[in-house]
From Swiss-Prot:
Keywords assigned: Cytoplasm, mRNA processing, mRNA splicing, Nucleus, Spliceosome
Gene behind this protein: CWC26
GO process annotations (BP): maintenance of RNA location; mRNA splicing, via spliceosome
UniProt-recorded name of the protein: Pre-mRNA-splicing factor CWC26
Coiled coil: none
Source domain of life: Eukaryota
Amino acid sequence: MSLNSYLTEAYGPKRAAKSRNGSKREAKVSNVSITDSAEQLVFTNNKPTGHATDIKAKAKRTGLFKNLETNELTEFKPASEVQEPNEVKMSSGAHAGLQSAEQVAEQIGKKQREAQREAAAAAVNKETVFRDSSGAQIADYSTYMRDRERADKLRERFQQNKSREMNMGDIQLHQLRNPDWRPARCEGEQIRRDDPAAQFTAESSAATYKLSPLGRKLYNKAWPENRFQIAPGWRWDGVDRSNGFEQKWFAKQGELAERKAQQMAAQQDY
């Protein structure tokens, strides 16, 4: 006879017994249930008080089981809710240490089922949570995207304006910042030709000089050509103190233009 059978016969529910006068009397049904597996038992550390009335009152509760050795009441919980002891677990869900292949497979499967259950519970009736680059949660995603697009357009426009201003000269920047500005004319052009008093200013007109669009005095004689057509200042003494790069640059440009013209002519001849 197994231990479970013995405990069931000794402490389990009994059949109704006949009394001496022939009438059946009610059998006392025990509230004690015998279980084979200890995994479904969770101890509540109820110390025995020694009072029979307290034990009977606790025994009337549903889902409570009595430990025959310690006389403690335990609560029944399904195996999925039973907390495992504090054991070291690996990332796969298996416990560390020497175990059988069946135990390892069961532990890994249990972790996978828990992950699937949590994912399914999180996906039900849940709204999508949007976050920005810093990790902060976005309350209104549509408004956030609209503001972000507007900020991107403003940033792009700023970069375009900045690059355009970098490629401008002083005159273009001055015109951009002062829309009503007009370039200054030469002093000779400012003199009215139909002015009867112009004949008295012949000597002064001979000494006139040109002005730049910004109103600066320019050199009024011949000066060497440069790539940017920048005239020297009006105080220049006419001595070229450069390293000759401008002359070499113009010579190279002329050589390239002549070579290109020769190639075009040779292609047309064939």
